[in-house]
């Protein structure tokens, strides 16, 4: 325990909180260009082919981002918007691609949770 005198001479320093999404640089979203679109497998005990994309952001950083929803139209050179949010079973994937914005199409035939997947309201 520090004495009062020691604290007067050198106050306590607040610990800096580390960001979970450093590439966003305190912005809600960032734009980027796909450099590679591929599938990868999750950690144990899960099993799937998860769709991910490597993205070069406007600030020059390159990140791996998850493509949510069923089916997508992304390929190399597609311009996308990314947001924060990690994928628990994919190590190193800390960002999500925003569906229904820029070059990313929304999920077709989506009835519930449409706003998360950029799907329009169905007719009737």
UniProtKB/Swiss-Prot annotation:
Membrane-crossing segments per the record: none
Residues bearing the modification 3-methylthioaspartic acid: 89
Disulfide-bond pairs as recorded: none
Coiled coil: none
One Gene Ontology biological process: translation
Region annotated Disordered, chain positions: 1-23, 103-124
Compositionally biased region (Basic residues): 113-124
Gene3D superfamilies from the UniProt entry: Nucleic acid-binding proteins
Keywords noted in UniProt: Methylation, Ribonucleoprotein, Ribosomal protein, RNA-binding, rRNA-binding, tRNA-binding
The UniProt record lists the keyword Iron-sulfur: no
Cellular compartments per GO CC: small ribosomal subunit
MF terms in GO: rRNA binding; structural constituent of ribosome; tRNA binding
InterPro entries registered for this protein in UniProt: NA-bd_OB-fold, Ribosomal_uS12, Ribosomal_uS12_bac
The protein's assembly and partners: Part of the 30S ribosomal subunit. Contacts proteins S8 and S17. May interact with IF1 in the 30S initiation complex.
Function as written in the Swiss-Prot or TrEMBL entry: With S4 and S5 plays an important role in translational accuracy. Interacts with and stabilizes bases of the 16S rRNA that are involved in tRNA selection in the A site and with the mRNA backbone. Located at the interface of the 30S and 50S subunits, it traverses the body of the 30S subunit contacting proteins on the other side and probably holding the rRNA structure together. The combined cluster of proteins S8, S12 and S17 appears to hold together the shoulder and platform of the 30S subunit.
Entry's family note: Belongs to the universal ribosomal protein uS12 family.
This protein's name: Small ribosomal subunit protein uS12
Annotated source species: Nitrosococcus oceani (strain ATCC 19707 / BCRC 17464 / JCM 30415 / NCIMB 11848 / C-107)
GN (gene name): rpsL
